[in-house]
Structure formats: C-alpha cells, structure tokens
Amino acid sequence: MFRQMKAFATSKVVVLDGYCVLASMLRHKKDLKIIQIWHALGAFKKFGRSVLDKEGGKSSKTAKAFKMHKNYSLIAASGDACVPFFSEAFGQPESRFIPIGIPRMDYLTDKEENARVRGNILLKYPQLDNGRKNILYAPTFRDTDEDRAALAAATKELVNKANYSDFNLIVKHHVVDSNKEQIYTDSRMNMAEGENFTAMDFMCVADYVVTDYSSVIYEALLKDLPIYIYCFDSDKYIDERGFYIDFWTDLPALYSKNAKGICDFIASGMRANSEKEEKFKKAYVNKRFDSITAEYGKLIDELARGVYDGRYNYGVISDDVQPQEEQESAADDHNAQESPDDPAVNTETAVNEEETENEQD
C-alpha cells in the first residue's frame, strides 16, 4: 500500500489493470493522470457498478464509501461496442474512454511470440503434437461448492465424450478455481497435468475453443479460432449473473448444453457464420494498430507532457486513424526542421496488479 501511495505521489502517469482502492479514494495532485486498462477483453458478464446490490456485486454503500472507479483520466476499451457497457460498469462518461484496444491484443496476434509459446507448450506436452487436432476447454470460475461440483461433472462428461482417435483435449481451469491444466490424448485415463500455461497460451496450439461465460471468446476471435459454448448450467448462471450482450443471439459461436453436442459440432467441422464473427470482432476487439502497446507508450508520454490531444477518445477515433508517427511523417519537411523535438521526459508509470476485480473473466 505504501509503495502504491508513493507511486501516486511521485508519478505523472499511473497505469492500472484492475480496481485499485487507493486510485479511487485518495485526493491526488491535479496534474496526475490515471489510465485504467481493464484486464479483460470485450464486454460480456456484468461487473462493477452494473451489479451493485446484486448477487456477486458490491453494495451501493460500499461503492460510495470507497468511491469505486473514481479518478480515472482515461479508460481503455477493446472496441467501440464495449464503451456504453463499460461506462455503466465504471460510472464514467463515454467521452473518457479510449477504444484503441489493450496490449494483450498484441500478444494474441504476434506470430513470432505465438510460435515461441507453441514451442514451449509442445516441449512440455509433446503428446499434443501427435497429428490430431487440439480442443481447448477453458470454462470460467464458479462461486459455490454446488456450482463447482456441477462444473466438475460437466468437465468429466466432455472428457468422456471426446473422440481421441481424431482429437486431443486440453482442459484449462480458471485461475480462481485451481489454475490446473489437464491434457487428454489416447483416452481419458491417459492424462498429463500441470500448472504451466494460461488459456491464452494454449490457444497457440488449439484448433477449437470450448468455453461458457468467459471473455476467452474475445481472445479466440482475435486468433480466428472457432468457438463453442458449453452452457450446461446456463439457466442458473444467466439468471444470477447477467450479461451486457444477448448471450443466445449475439455471440458468434455454436451452443450446446451437453458434451455430445459440442463434440458433434467439432467433429462435423461446424462453426459460426464467418460474417457474424467478423462483425462481432470489429465491434468488440477492433485491432486498429499493428502495435497497440506502442500507441500506449506514446499516449503515456503525451499525458506526462500535457500535450495529449484527445484523438483516441470515444466519438473522436475512427477506423482510418493513423499511428502518430505516420501523421508526423505526412507533415511538411520544413515544419519538421523548424520544430525541434521536445526534451526527453522521464515518465514514471505505476502499474497496479495487486487489487483486481475478477468478475468479468
């Protein structure tokens, strides 16, 4: 906590990737800029102020006392369609959002990095390189013992129904549950287990992604992987949790409440309509830049120097936006020569990873 307080007191820009109590509660110096780069892609399960006084959410009194999600200068979103939902969740005006994506989107689409991760996975689990297609099952966490038991039973059913003549099955449990991965190849009795990679990592070797109510769907979309929704407990889960989008009609995925249906979809090569996939991807995970991370670097520098012009803000940015260096290269040569570079600024950036809300994952 004291380390965070020092960061807020001495930094020009603070970058968060989750809920930080001190960011919201403290009275900061006027020139401090706080950027919230929320850790989950897309807008799916309701969270934050959208679920106040509801099951799984905080109370209104707690939110008011802790000034939940206050003091943000800018808030990142992975696509334009996320902004109205995030505005509700954070209790912030839409004009404060920058729908330019988040750095994780670079990782998901970096071919060299993905090849490196794939190599590491196959080194650890060489049985996944046996010529068969790999199915990744990455369910979200469950809150109660009853729900966790139901998930365990559904997972066992999927393990039993998989056709190991044609497929391998990777089960990656949510970090809130066990974080374990289980690799099934020749049969359900032939299993390797560990805790070495994330679900996002396993997408580097996956051919199909099976999930339920997880933002994994957005990660799979960026990698152009077919998505299947194994919604064995949908009646209960949807009633209790709530979604920003229509669970049954908006997602570019195929649905089944039983494992056989999921396995049949995959075996027959069925996937969602490609036009629906592309439309949804552009709305919720629109990768406008080759390097989103580089754009954040420039944005942070401009905020620290007090020269950010608002070009990335919601309602201003468009799909034909150019990276800043391309805009600068289009300027007249004599203007570039007559305008010396600004002196270097030593920007202190504090990244918070200690206090996060996991509701959306």
Regions found by a protein language model. Give the residues of each.
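Active-site and donor-binding regions of nucleotide-sugar-utilizing enzymes
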Residues: 1-112
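Donor nucleotide-activated moiety binding/catalytic core segment of transferases
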Residues: 2-9, 175-218
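Short active-site oxyanion
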Residues: 12, 70-75, 168, 205-208, ...
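A donor-sugar binding/catalytic signature common to diverse glycosyltransferases
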Residues: 14-20, 25-28, 33-38, 196-241
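Helix N-cap/beta->alpha junction signal
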Residues: 18, 78-81, 173-175, 213, ...
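Conserved catalytic-core segment of nucleotide-activated headgroup transferases in glycan assembly
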Residues: 97-183, 256, 316
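C-terminal amphipathic helix plus adjacent low-complexity
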Residues: 113, 259-260, 264-334, 338-342, ...
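Catalytic binding pocket for nucleotide-activated donors in carbohydrate/polymer assembly enzymes
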Residues: 215-284
